[in-house]
């Protein structure tokens, strides 16, 4: 059981790939490490295709074990449960660059499982998992046209940094992950602090160049430890069936793709499919309807692509650089804190912003510990948005991924906690969809945040772009439709302000997309983004000066950190009483910052006054309003300044001789007292003498009793 090990330097880190010792019944297994962050990746591939299988069933699962960080899971069951949002996003990150590298017609089931088994807090496991998956697939012998490399690129002090540590990443204006083969970039996922298109493209090129060392070392690793390549041959096309389908459907499909309205076009195409299937299966019952649909889909692609390359109008009649008609409404929901309805052609997003307090922040339990997130973004894609029925429930992988992309687009313009002490949640409800719903969510979110009075640094817009390439000729499409997304060779999404890019996502399906092509595409995307921003600025030019009447007002005050315990009180009694009496929410930071959230300004004012009383220092000779809390034989205890207790001795109630304290004072009675002395132990001595004019304390009590009667 001697493992085969490959070790190499990758930037400032050391990468180790090991196989042959663990999980020997899997098709391939690799233990991938980068500076003590270790991910165990397995690949299992079925030798036989499932009966009736007509698509490529690739599954990628990524899971983090808490033992990797020396921790025991929380919760009742004390074990890992369903994948977290972070795990889902990393699974997608692995899936996206490897999926296009399997040949067309390969339908064998493959499962990739990446398990984090050791974690160095300075090294993110996502990159290690991508490298491990590339190595395992390359070793497995399946028809995988890899390997791929992966790189994270940061931008610190105007310099690109390869695979920055988590500490370095906090200083970076860019978090970009790029994956590709030795010849081409396949995937980009990034967020940026408003960088130019030129800087983003340079980062992609830098990352692709640097990851070549990974690809070369995986190739050497495969020579030493790889399994024999599968003897898989692509199925021969059924030319007879193709010609029959072509004769029946091609001309009709050409006419259908001149229908600009999506639903009408889809109805026509569905009718053509049903008709062709009925005719051909009537002639020969052995013909699979799935095969017929595949041929029709290929014909659709050919028709649309050839028209685009020939310079003809697109499916909906637009030119290549035209953005669909925009319609924007803000403040569409009367009781929400901020809302906007953003419509671009047949894609529509209803975005809603909600303001909350510190206690509404999301606590994320990561491998390296808990962290708090003050900006939440949720994307919902209900089936009615595309005119279908379907299951409603927890978000799917796609919804999680689109929500994170939209969040990345907006994050760079969000105010800091000091500038705006609210937790903010944005929800994007996709109510119609025909391409680019994630970028509609970016636009809708920007509008809803401004409607809510969130002081974002600038408006943000997003645009989805496509590319069709045939040999040396290529066409870049602005604001792609759903059909153009499926039929194109590259789709990429860019979000940003007038000053620069905040998020970039690319998925490339073919080789030959050069940096020059990417540059042209990014510049065309910039023009589309500026157009959308212009329309958005007409709808709402700046964030509203006031937040909604229905949103909590957060009032901030500062107290001495040593006094925090006084405000909280024994067992939280004081702060609990304050919140219950006033209907407010109170949060206190360790530095003494107190945040009071209330929809009623008067309630917030009362709380601030009470807190000021609680933290105020008692001064000798000062006169205070107080409340009698206890009556004893030798005097009475009086609460002043929100809970500080002092003693009025029996001799200090009045100048007259007092036989019984109860004759003069009772529990709950409001009195005025003067501080005589603060003893070394902190005990406060009070007096009531000469504080009620000429009347004695006894007379005051009698007057109160008479009024009560």
UniProtKB/Swiss-Prot annotation:
Q: Which GO terms describe its molecular function?
A: 3'-5'-RNA exonuclease activity; magnesium ion binding; polyribonucleotide nucleotidyltransferase activity; RNA binding
Extract the InterPro entries matched here.
Answer: ExoRNase_PH_dom1 (IPR001247), ExoRNase_PH_dom2 (IPR015847), ExoRNase_PH_dom2_sf (IPR036345), KH_dom (IPR004087), KH_dom_type_1 (IPR004088), KH_dom_type_1_sf (IPR036612), NA-bd_OB-fold (IPR012340), PNPase (IPR012162)
* Keyword annotations from UniProtKB, A to Z: Cytoplasm, Magnesium, Metal-binding, Nucleotidyltransferase, RNA-binding, Transferase
Q: Which GO terms describe its biological process?
A: mRNA catabolic process; RNA processing
> Where does the record place the KH domain?
552-611
| Top EC group | transferase
Q: Output the Pfam families linked to this UniProt entry.
A: KH_1, PNPase, RNase_PH, RNase_PH_C, S1
State the CDD domains in the record.
KH-I_PNPase (cd02393), RNase_PH_PNPase_1 (cd11363), RNase_PH_PNPase_2 (cd11364), S1_PNPase (cd04472)
Of the GO CC terms on this record, one is: cytosol
Cofactors:
Mg(2+)
Is Ligase included in the keywords of this UniProt record? no
Query: Catalysed reaction(s)?
Result: RNA(n+1) + phosphate = RNA(n) + a ribonucleoside 5'-diphosphate
Q: Where in the cell is it found?
A: Cytoplasm
Which Enzyme Commission number(s) are on file for it? 2.7.7.8
Sequence ranges assigned to domain S1 motif in this UniProt record: 621-689
Major location, coarse class? Answer: cytoplasm
Q: At which positions is Mg(2+) bound?
A: 485, 491
- PANTHER family membership: POLYRIBONUCLEOTIDE NUCLEOTIDYLTRANSFERASE (PTHR11252), POLYRIBONUCLEOTIDE NUCLEOTIDYLTRANSFERASE 1, MITOCHONDRIAL (PTHR11252:SF0)
General function of this protein:
Involved in mRNA degradation. Catalyzes the phosphorolysis of single-stranded polyribonucleotides processively in the 3'- to 5'-direction.
Subunit note: Component of the RNA degradosome, which is a multiprotein complex involved in RNA processing and mRNA degradation.
Which family is this protein grouped under?
Answer: Belongs to the polyribonucleotide nucleotidyltransferase family.
For this entry, the protein name equals Polyribonucleotide nucleotidyltransferase
Name the gene: pnp
